Amino acid sequence: MTIKLRFVASLALVFGLAAASVPAQASGGDTPHLQSWSFAGPFGQYDKAQLRRGFQVFQNVCVSCHTLENGGFRNLPSRAAPNWPLDEVRQLAASWPVQVKDINDKGDPMQRAPKLPDRIPSQYANEAAARIIHNGAVPPDLSVIAKARTFQRGFPWWVTDIFTQYNENGVDYIVALLNGYEDPPERFKVPDGSFYNKYFPGHIIGMTPPIADGLVTYGDGTPETQLQYSKDVAAFLMWAAEPTLDVRKRIGWWVLGFLVIFTGLLVATKIVVWRPVKKGLA
């Protein structure tokens, strides 16, 4: 078999496997709709106002069950985002309802209010305590949920995603999940204490519908709807999972610019160096 035929056969195998994988992916749950995000694409940046609203939703709704182990109060005043005033973050940490464990000057264990350098404390003493409260289940930590929970778009969309640089599967899934609660179809049995969600794999989820219209009060005039809440908290969780996204993209463009200029200089140097040699050989 020639190299060309092997290449064609390999492409056919890849596309065939991709096409065959679509039903398996779709059977786990409906495909979420794509949302519009300020941080999408190569030029995208976080919307600081949206991140603040998202943290507000997390603080008032999500934190009652979920943790944010990798999240720290010190990250909130970050110049990248959400860029909160330092004094406000200090007050926020001091008023946080869960205290942190520490050691006093005498070496005895104590509890105190969180400070700016601290991580956002967990409301559970340990995993066993979380299981007791939630009937044997442990609510997932949300630190990297926007990157860990996602969905596959299947063929041919993964091909176009290479060029559009679509990488927001996780936040699209979060928005879909928070808005996917509905009555189950006929003859679909949902166990007591569980709920039907068309976007959750298997469609049976143990989490109570967490948000509803008017649940959180915004102070900037943003619509206080379930869909808006879900978008805002999804954006915040994306920032929690990738807080340096803004910086990474800005540095990336500087690097690409440097490579373009450096490549041009190399080409020009090659022309200048080899032009006399070529003339001498002519």
UniProtKB/Swiss-Prot annotation:
MF terms (GO), sorted A to Z: electron transfer activity; heme binding; metal ion binding
InterPro entries: Cyt_c-like_dom, Cyt_c-like_dom_sf, Cyt_c1
Keyword Transmembrane helix in annotation: yes
Key words, A-Z: Cell membrane, Electron transport, Heme, Iron, Membrane, Metal-binding, Respiratory chain, Signal, Transmembrane, Transmembrane helix, Transport
Domain of life assignment: Bacteria
Residue stretches spanning the membrane: 253-273
Its job: Component of the ubiquinol-cytochrome c reductase complex (complex III or cytochrome b-c1 complex), which is a respiratory chain that generates an electrochemical potential coupled to ATP synthesis. c1 functions as an electron donor to cytochrome c.
The protein, known as: Cytochrome c1
